[in-house]
């Protein structure tokens, strides 16, 4: 086995090895958290080295257990998977740092279980990122669902259990009824489940492809396209580090990553643009963008507002994939990274506010920015990135998505994306504005001693906010990975 293949497998195995260390150190919080941080650092090192190897032109793949002829556990590194794995590994480190401050500051129980499930989830993310076929993708997709269920129900309350049932029910139902059926249909029709540049279907299989496309889009429930989005707001009962994991690092990104990969490597854009079901799904995704934004405006609970914002932003990426042109794929790939940093910043800030002030409702946060200036400033920066305004990195991904709608002659969708950005302004910017400029009703009351969240959490949210700015000033690495993805998928210049 070559060293590159060993590194590939280690990216999946290192988080699992961390599980053993976390359990062994369960009675010693400092050691337990050191194990988690160390594993995250090792994962970043491995992922970055794989990035360098593939940039030099080396093909890295590994085939393992073969279930049936043509159906094997297969990993293959390509640019979109690298982009996803780099984001996942880096944000695992930052989220672990944040969790140390949050879990201790909030005096959460079962912290060892939390770190164990988190590590298993990250291992699943690496498996999804490097999956070389639909079979491998499906296995790790399901492991990710099951490993995050205990995180959603972490509090152990009836509300948490109900949220967990909705979470598990929707994600397992969609994946088994639709996604698994789509994979079987692909294998039967095309004779393969491997991801291939240009897709696996030919023109004679257009009808079958048109039937299978909705099964994939609805079956990948983690992409949260309406009406299969309810699991996402239901999961907001989880601790904030879990919400950050769900919305930025792992679960939803696994969803839209899978949608983008299926559209490019299973259908191919030449065929995708000809399918009658593509048009329907494209406008359904556009409707999800607007409807979720409107629902977000009505939420007073901060995490609920951010949850519906996530539903809307994920549909941007689905729109990019279904537009079936290179600008859409480029914008969708870049938005995976841009949204990750913007949204994780917002959730980190929401958690910091809850730990420091015990406030969860936006209407109670007037004047809070004067006592938590770093947190509220970070929230402002994250908001700009989600909206798509400088100096937020989301500016660039939304730019390419707008270009894609023009190139595809979908002016209605261009208006939808513009209207959504205006709605983003309406439901995000008033929060820091009121936090800094409105009078603080508790300035002389019982809450006058409220200050910033614990230092580890404050460092984490500051780093992700800085990341939003860095991705605006220096988007080249993300852009280059996205363009390499276009080349690998045979889309460059399309």
Residue ranges and their predicted role:
Residues 1-7, 19-116, 191-200, 483-492:
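Transmembrane helix-loop-helix hairpins at membrane boundaries of multipass inner-membrane proteins
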Residues 11-12, 210, 223, 471-472:
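Hydrophobic alpha-helical transmembrane segments of integral membrane proteins
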Residues 29-40, 162-172, 244, 371-376, ...:
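Alpha-helical transmembrane segments and their helix-start/interface "positive-inside/aromatic belt" motifs
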Residues 37-51, 173-182, 382, 463-477:
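Hydrophobic alpha-helical membrane-insertion segments
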Residues 89, 251, 397, 460-462:
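Core segments of transmembrane alpha-helices
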Residues 94-112, 118-137, 147-399, 403-434:
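Hydrophobic transmembrane alpha-helices and their helix-loop junctions in integral membrane proteins
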Residues 142:
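Short phosphate-coordinating micro-motif centered on Lys-Gly-acidic
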Residues 370-376, 429-494:
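Cytoplasmic/organellar membrane-interface segments at the starts of transmembrane helices
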